[in-house]
């Protein structure tokens, strides 16, 4: 049995940028009770507004959003907020992985991903 405890010892802010309600629910269920303060927005404009007022430790960023592609937003996050860690999630094939990582994503997870993959990714980023 694998122990998947998270490194967070105090409340860490995590912003979820995802427009699909079902995926938001899954992410919230996975991270609920794990010492995180979870916030959620459904598009890039809302994410930009959020980041101007809040500084999450981690952004979980979907690629395909109503107002653009998350992969294109990564550079803006890294330029303006270089300490924020980014986990890019995408249902597209892994060809997006290289672009996402080149643009500054710290982790790329292809949908569907496991709870353990998400835990391990966040754990590593918060060390």
Predicted segments with their positions:
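Two-component/phosphorelay signaling modules centered on CheY-like receiver
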Residues: 21-39
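Acidic catalytic/metal-coordinating carboxylates
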Residues: 43, 69-72
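Conserved acidic carboxylate
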Residues: 18
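Non-catalytic signal-transmission and effector/linker regions of two-component phosphorelay proteins
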Residues: 1-15, 57, 116-127
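Alpha4 helix (beta4-alpha4-beta5 surface) of REC/receiver domains from two-component response regulators
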Residues: 72, 92-109
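Acidic, metal-coordinating helix/loop segments flanking the phosphotransfer/catalytic sites
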Residues: 40-58
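Active-site residues of response regulator receiver
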Residues: 62
């Amino acid at each position: 049995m694998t122990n998947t405890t998270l490194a967070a010892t105090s409340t860490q802010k995590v912003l979820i940028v995802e427009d699909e309600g079902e995926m938001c629910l899954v992410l919230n269920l996975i991270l609920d009770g794990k010492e995180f303060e979870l916030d959620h927005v459904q598009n890039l404009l809302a994410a930009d507004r959020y980041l101007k007022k809040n500084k999450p430790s981690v952004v979980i960023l979907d690629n395909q959003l109503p107002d653009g592609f998350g992969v294109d937003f990564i550079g803006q996050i890294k330029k303006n907020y270089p300490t924020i860690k980014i986990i890019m999630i995408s249902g597209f094939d892994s060809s997006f992985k290289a672009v996402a990582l080149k643009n500054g994503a710290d982790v790329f997870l292809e949908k569907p991903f496991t709870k353990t993959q998400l835990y391990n990714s966040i754990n590593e980023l918060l060390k």
